Design a protein with these regions (language model features):
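Canonical Radical SAM [4Fe-4S] cluster-binding loop centered on the CxxxCxxC motif
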Residues: 150-201, 209-210, 214, 218-233
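C-terminal catalytic core of tyrosine-transesterase DNA break-rejoin enzymes
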Residues: 437
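Acidic carboxylate-rich catalytic motifs and surrounding loops in phosphoryl-/glycosyl-chemistry enzymes
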Residues: 422-427
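Phosphate/nucleotide-binding beta-alpha loop and adjacent structural elements of enzyme active sites
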Residues: 430
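Flexible, acidic/Gly-rich N-terminal and inter-domain linker regions that tether
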Residues: 1-155, 208-236
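Short linear Ser/Thr-Pro motifs
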Residues: 126, 160-161, 288, 311
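Conserved AdoMet/S-adenosylmethionine-binding subsite of the radical SAM
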Residues: 199-205, 235-420
Length: 441
């Protein structure tokens, strides 16, 4: 830990004295932390080896691999490129729509390259149809969710990377369900293709005037605008605006960095130029983590200009041990050091996510401590995004009071740490941050 702090270039400041700290809530209130045989918080970093894998899909392969497979099938390699155009640019897997392919080859190509991955079970709309939560059934019956949001000048998709989550965070509905399995590269990518298909069909409505005004009030630094630099300038909504997903946030179900290889392959498929991939901007992609420190440093070294978000939720280990069980493995300062390493390596500003929980982590001294720790490592490298805690089933915890949230933000901004309260799109349909649980009822 000390070595990591030295590498980051600054020591962590001392915490306030114990006398200056109000007691946190009793550890047993609301939940009991599951522990392993050694008494450590029970975490799932990997899926069972007995889990059946999804069928291989075009999106699992590079263009060269698709061409090679087509040739193995006795089909000219350029047909794989044509098929890629249909999937990544026309968002279709229907052979009837692929009229540029010989009729004798269409069914065979679709069967081999485009097996069905996500079957829509249900969609729920809110925000006058500008937000849609999808429930998908995967090939093995596992359920995942994604949330599509149209803002006035961008379209954002919150995607899942795992079926469930093994991080066991008590205030997150996904974390309380445990980990079923990792999603494949193609299952991750197919969420975007399916969303683009919905947009192309005109099934995602425009935001209403109030939402446009509220986003303008945030100066482009609300829910996801801050994550895609250069794409968050407020303007009036135009029907001629974006007609496909431009922003991706890995903030759905799962811990993305616990499924590192498949998530990174999915990111590459997103940014690969069409028809090899979706041709998206890497700057519009955000990966969030609860703090898997070695993976954060590995991500920094990937040389991809994506945005990184650290779900911190408490600046002190006393509380973070309770809220974020992985803090037992890597402490708060180690996670912040890794986030700072990401900034120094990539030049990309880091986001700190912080769910404000009433009487738990919203104390003024915690805002001050957070500011001290961030400023000790430098200025201009980080933006804090507090968000009111979203309700989850059976939780006794609630969101902070508005005046408490305002004071928390005031202290951070006053200390020179750029801070903006995040939007809570999708809360009414359990589609907001921490609410995704993939339940059919």
């Amino acid at each position: 830990m000390a070595a990591a702090r030295k590498a980051a270039g600054a020591p962590a400041p001392a915490a306030p004295s114990q006398d200056a700290r109000p007691q946190v809530r009793p550890k047993a209130e609301g939940w009991t932390q599951a522990v392993d045989a050694e008494g450590r918080p029970k975490l799932q970093f990997a899926q069972s080896k007995r889990v059946k894998q999804p069928p291989q899909h075009l999106a699992d392969m590079t263009l060269d691999e698709r061409i090679a497979k087509a040739k193995e099938m006795g089909i000219p390699g350029f047909r794989a490129k044509q098929l890629s155009v249909h999937y990544f640019q026309h968002y279709t897997a229907d052979p009837a729509e692929m009229t540029d392919l010989p009729a004798a080859e269409r069914e065979k190509l679709v069967e081999e390259f485009l097996p069905p991955l996500l079957t829509e079970v249900r969609r729920l709309k809110t925000d006058d149809g500008a937000t849609i939560k999808f429930l998908w059934r995967l090939f093995d019956g596992a359920l995942v969710e994604s949330v599509l949001m149209r803002y006035k000048n961008r379209i954002t998709l919150c995607i899942s990377s795992q079926c469930g989550c093994g991080m066991n965070c008590p205030f997150c509905a996904t974390g309380q369900n445990g980990l079923t399995r990792n999603m494949s590269t193609a299952e991750i990518v197919d969420q975007i293709v399916q969303a683009n298909r919905v947009i192309a069909a005109g099934e995602l409505d425009a935001p209403n005037a109030q939402e446009i005004a509220e986003e303008a009030d945030h100066s482009g630094l609300g829910e996801e605008a801050d994550f895609a630099e250069g794409e968050g300038t407020p303007s009036s909504y135009s029907p001629s605006g974006p007609q496909r997903v431009g922003n991706i946030v890995f903030m759905g179900m799962g811990e993305p960095l616990a499924n590192y290889k498949r998530v990174m392959n999915a990111v590459r498929r997103m940014v690969d130029p069409a028809p090899e991939g979706l041709g998206m901007s890497a700057r519009g992609i955000t990966i969030s983590t609860v703090g898997l420190v070695p993976a954060i440093r590995k991500l920094a070294d990937e040389n991809l200009p994506i945005t990184f978000a650290l779900s911190l939720h408490a600046p002190d280990d006393e509380l973070r041990d309770e809220l974020i069980p992985v803090n037992d493995r890597w402490k708060a300062d180690e996670a912040i050091d890794a986030a700072y390493y990401y900034y120094k390596t990539t030049g990309r500003r880091v986001s700190i996510e912080y769910a404000l929980i009433k009487d738990m982590n919203d104390h003024p001294w915690r805002a001050d401590l957070l500011a001290e720790k961030l400023n000790a490592r430098g200025r201009g490298w980080v933006h804090v995004n507090p968000i009111p805690l979203n309700p989850t089933p059976n939780s006794v915890w609630t969101s902070s009071e508005p005046q408490v949230m305002r004071e928390f933000l005031r202290r951070l901004n006053g200390a020179g740490v750029p801070t903006t309260l995040r939007d809570t799109r999708g809360k009414e349909i359990d589609g907001a941050c921490g609410q995704l649980a993939a339940a059919e009822d």
